[in-house]
């Protein structure tokens, strides 16, 4: 690239390597449903090129509690709020059996300004918790992750963070290929 004397030769090398991956359509591709890319029940799907694997009874990169503690609210607090349709969050079932201390709350602007309502990634990335006002209207209170929810193991009352962690996705390959083509003055529209 632009560092250490690189240039078109580096971009060409990158483009060729990325095209090799893109051309393996039997092995890699984009999923129709973005939420399925990160689903515990859909590990090693067609969009995943390389991931750090996590499984039950093995050491995992989530440290069993780190991600949950930092990103999720306590279940008893979360259950006091509503979803966007005014239904109690507790009615969402196993999907919200999480516990944490939400040390890193997501800024509400990420949800309201970075995504529009037609963006399918919005509700597949973040879930909103609403407060029901006295007049019956809903007010956005906070957010919690919709990705990397883990799984509910037999006999457990909270989810275990056993999701694989994608390092390279097919979507990354397409974006990098488009960037390499753009640096070479080629048309990246196909990607």
Question: What would you call each of these model-derived segments?
Answer:
Residues 1-5, 175, 182:
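Specific register positions within alpha-helical solenoid repeats of the TPR/Sel1-like families, i.e.
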Residues 4-7, 40:
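Hydrophobic alpha-helical scaffolding
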